[in-house]
């Protein structure tokens, strides 16, 4: 809002139902994350893999008849990543190896947000739901190294993933008499991950990982006007923004695995993920407890079924419209993996 210009009043009754607006919401939605990859050994020491994955994603929906509908009703971010990774193995000593790791990715990113707009805002009108749709494509890369000692099932890996820059283009609909063209610059954050595993006894494996993600690089994402002179908006004028104000993300995992026989093995893990929220979002600290079972019916075929139960911490959510308190929440995840060797 401009200094000295009062904000329009926020009613306490839902414009769609006429009933009092709810002060309690359930914003999280279920979503799935597919991943497909294929690896080929070009030589004894050189191997490459192509993959498809969806690295970034979120889906929340608080509904229309809530106080938070003035900030955002539904928010959805989807991504697609088409990548290739290669590794080259170099002998080190009598039994060890060092691997050089590298890869590139082509990524697509789409964002959607809907928001309740009251009367008295720019362009006038009655209560209505405005929507933001944007998308773009970008390229990222990664590089790293690994040390392996197969005799002890030991492997240590360090990988750096670059940021992926996007110049998001799209429209805001139902705010003005005609759709408004908007633009914004944002980058998917860079990250560094260290993984380690080693045998600790016959058929027993210990594993751990630490990952840092530069989420603090994402603060407020402004969407500015592009070619909207028909409604009196100059180029570069901010129309809306997505205020996140993240802090750095840290993810720490520890676990243990056991091979029961030639066909069955399992693993148990504990993961702590430091929330990126600074009070503007609900991404608080997360504890996740996972179990996995691997079944290998034959030499060239294996399956993995894994599940996790997590505890998402409580917090307070503050933005320009409202202040909300939320309690601890239960989160669950389930994954199924199949691997075929040719």
Where on the chain are the PLM-derived regions?
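Outer-membrane beta-barrel porins/channels
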Residues: 6-14, 33, 41-342
């Amino acid at each position: 809002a401009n200094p000295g210009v009062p904000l329009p009043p926020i009613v306490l009754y839902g414009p769609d139902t006429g009933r009092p607006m709810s002060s309690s919401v359930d914003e999280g939605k279920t979503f799935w994350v597919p991943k497909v990859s294929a690896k080929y050994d070009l030589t004894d020491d050189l191997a490459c893999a192509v993959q498809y994955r969806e690295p970034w994603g979120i889906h929340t929906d608080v509904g229309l008849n809530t106080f938070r509908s003035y900030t955002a009703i539904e928010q959805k971010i989807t991504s697609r990543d088409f990548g290739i990774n290669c590794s080259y193995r170099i002998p080190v000593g009598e039994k060890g190896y060092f691997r050089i790791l590298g890869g590139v990715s082509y990524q697509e990113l789409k964002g959607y947000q809907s928001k309740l707009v009251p009367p008295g805002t720019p362009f006038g009108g009655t209560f209505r739901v405005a929507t933001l749709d944007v998308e773009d494509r970008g390229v990222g890369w990664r590089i790293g190294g690994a040390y392996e000692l197969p005799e002890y099932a030991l492997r240590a890996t360090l990988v750096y993933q670059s940021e992926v820059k996007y110049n998001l283009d799209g429209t805001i609909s139902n705010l003005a008499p005609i759709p408004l063209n908007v633009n914004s610059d944002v980058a998917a954050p860079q990250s560094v991950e260290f993984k380690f595993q080693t045998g600790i006894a016959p058929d027993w494996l210990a594993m751990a990982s630490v990952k840092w993600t530069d989420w603090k690089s994402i603060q407020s994402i402004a969407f500015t006007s592009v070619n909207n002179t028909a409604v009196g908006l100059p180029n570069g004028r901010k129309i809306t923004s997505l205020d996140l104000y993240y802090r750095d993300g840290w993810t720490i995992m520890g676990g243990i695995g056991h091979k029961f026989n030639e066909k069955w093995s399992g693993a148990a893990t504990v993961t702590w993920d430091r929330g990126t929220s600074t009070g503007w979002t609900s991404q608080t600290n997360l504890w996740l407890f996972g179990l996995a079972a691997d079944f290998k019916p034959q030499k060239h075929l294996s399956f993995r079924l894994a599940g996790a139960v997590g505890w998402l911490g409580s917090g307070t959510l503050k933005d320009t419209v409202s202040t909300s308190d939320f309690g601890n929440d239960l989160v669950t995840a389930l994954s199924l993996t199949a691997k075929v060797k040719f």
